């Protein structure tokens, strides 16, 4: 494909992803949902071009989100996991052993989530009350629930990829 087409499609995907990231500061619950959806959009770039191009789009969306988005916690989640995981997923799934795939996916997820927690706590200065329910400090419970959610999220990314390839792609790129 021509480089101009790659740049144009990358710009369109970047724009859509950035709009989702901007909505994190406007719509309640967007802190977690919109970074997920924004990251899923990057799979289109992986499918149409390459992971290299998708990482460029990820970088642009990350930088612009850091500058423009109101919900910095959501931006941290996007930068440290949701933005690059759908791109990395394609590389991990090239491995033959499913058990190794899942092990790597969970290692990546847990390292990223713990990093996001530490960035939020020590750089964004999110107070301990945000991680407290009924007076109990429960980040480990959040991590456990996050691991359950991750299995669902990974499956959703796979379903989105299939939906894009088999239903949406031909409608966008008519030949």
Name every feature range the model reports, one short phrase each.
Residues 1-53:
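Hydrophobic transmembrane alpha-helices
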Residues 3, 136-175:
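Alpha-helical transmembrane segments and their cytosolic interface
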Residues 7-12, 33, 55-59, 75-76, ...:
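Hydrophobic alpha-helical transmembrane segments
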Residues 22-31, 62-91:
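Interfacial aromatic-anchored transmembrane helix boundaries in multi-pass membrane proteins
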Residues 38, 57-65, 81-82, 105-109:
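Transmembrane alpha-helical core residues of multi-pass small-molecule transporters
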Residues 71, 106-123, 147, 151, ...:
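Mid-bilayer segments of alpha-helical transmembrane spans in multi-pass integral membrane proteins
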Residues 79-114, 118:
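Short helix-perturbing small/polar motifs within transmembrane alpha-helices
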Residues 122-137:
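Membrane-interface helix termini and inter-helical loops of multi-pass transporters
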């Amino acid at each position: 494909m021509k480089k101009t087409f790659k740049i144009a499609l990358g710009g369109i995907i970047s724009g859509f992803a950035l709009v989702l990231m901007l909505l994190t500061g406007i719509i309640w619950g967007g802190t977690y949902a919109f970074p997920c959806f924004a990251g899923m959009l990057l799979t289109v770039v992986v499918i149409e071009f390459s992971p290299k191009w998708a990482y460029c789009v990820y970088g642009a969306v990350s930088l612009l989100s850091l500058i423009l988005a109101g919900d910095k916690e959501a931006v941290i989640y996007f930068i440290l996991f949701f933005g690059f995981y759908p791109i990395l997923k394609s590389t991990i799934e090239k491995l033959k052993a499913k058990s190794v795939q899942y092990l790597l996916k969970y290692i990546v997820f847990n390292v990223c989530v713990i990093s996001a927690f530490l960035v939020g706590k020590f750089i964004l200065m999110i107070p301990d009350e945000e991680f407290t329910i009924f007076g109990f400090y429960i980040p480990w419970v959040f991590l456990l629930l996050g691991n359950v959610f991750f299995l669902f999220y990974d499956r959703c990314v796979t379903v989105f990829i299939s939906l894009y390839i088999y239903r949406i792609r031909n409608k966008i790129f008519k030949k």
